[in-house]
Amino acid sequence: MKENIISFFILNIFLLGCSSDNNSSEVDETFTVSGKVVDSDGSGLANISLTIGNQTVYSSASGEWSVSNLKDSVKITPMADGYTFTPASATASSTLTVTFVAEKTAIDLSAEAENIVAWFENVQYSNGLLPSTESSSTMSLYDNALAALVFTATGKYSKAESIFNFFNQRIGSELTTNGGFYQFRSTDGTTSGARWVGDNAWLLIALNNYMAKVETTKYDKLKSTLEIWIRSLQDKDGGLWGGITASNSTISKNTEGMIDAYCAVQGYDDFHKKLLAHLKENRYNSTDGLLVSWPGNYYEYALDNHSWGYCTFEDFPKTVLEKTTMYANTQRATANGALITGFAPDIDKDIVWLEGTGQMVVAYQKAADSYKSTTYLAEMRKLLISSTLYPNSVGLPYASNLGTTYGSSQLWKGADTNICISSSAWYLFGLLNFDPMAVGYSRGTPDVDKFWKD
């Protein structure tokens, strides 16, 4: 009996020792939590913030996230402006994998979009064209191309056709006679300004989008004649002349116009190959990995080359969208006093350029960077203003405040207070998740010609 009691005590001591060792092991043990943030279609969402204990991490480009060496119990909470998540949070005290499904916050975007489109419809003249700003008598080719894209994106095809019809009727009197449509014209039809390759390219981009949705041969001649003129501007070095001035002299080559033309002329042939070769040799800083707007100048870079370059060229690096802090700034809006953060057209950073900020939203959406696209869309929303002429019609001014455009040129009076086409259109494209440069994006560019991948 005594031996049994002694054995019992020895066994208990052994078990207690083992228990103590096990508890010590559990205290020292660490674990990993990981998972993914996806949208309702199961696609990964980038740059979603996740608070995990006292740490903050961000989801990768594919939506994945992971944190290791955790102890005790931690709460995992995803956060992003404009989104709700299911589950709203999760708790882990051991290795755990969890997927958060993000849904856009229930903002009545449809009503907002309808009020923007209503403004476009209200300002359209009987001849089909729209003034560039409310109460303006100036009609811009680029702005009307954007308006045609607005109507196409929202299924208002007859409104888009009214714009195309105007130019279709002037193929002989303008396009084939002078080469290219004029940059500006007044409400009575009087033309002025240069005939820019970029503006004409955007009319072709609008046609490409329309013809991708509507089966018609009505605008085949307009499309082919625009393309022929754009191709005719290619120099022997592969670059494109910027167009023709009002005095019929040649406009120097500009990067933005060459991007526009590359996007507008569909397919891939020697035109595109030579154009890429020119950009590589003359308009690309391989050290910075950026397209150059003005070689050797103080204003070397321009914002739209980041966004349009990314949306136009296949496999263009996402890093170009990250290298835009040189333009980021915050201003107090003239129209309503709101503080708004966005991008300037250049390094002066004296305005928030709403059109350019909208272009960045579209580029961020293409890059699946939902955090930044949602953030800057919300910033732009602060400057939605009501029409002074039409009820239930809203839009955005060109800029937050008066300052300079690209370079040192001053903005016009009213650029910070009057609704304009360009900013309103690009904001709407962001609302609709519509990329006008997506049609024809996959053109089979050979890897050897993609200089940005060198």
Predicted regions and their residues:
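Bacterial Sec-dependent N-terminal signal peptides
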Residues: 8, 12-35, 99-111
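Structural motif
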Residues: 30-46
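Short, acidic Ser/Thr/Gly-rich low-complexity loop/linker segments typical of extracellular
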Residues: 44, 54-66
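Hydrophobic beta-strand segments
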Residues: 48-52, 76
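Short Pro-Gly-centered beta-turn/loop motif in secreted/extracellular proteins
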Residues: 64-75, 81, 94
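A short, solvent-exposed loop/turn motif at the edges and junctions
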Residues: 77-89
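Extended ligand-binding clefts on enzyme/binding-domain cores
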Residues: 107-142, 176-186, 192-198, 212, ...
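Alpha-helical support elements that line or immediately flank enzyme active sites
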Residues: 145-157, 167, 307, 313, ...
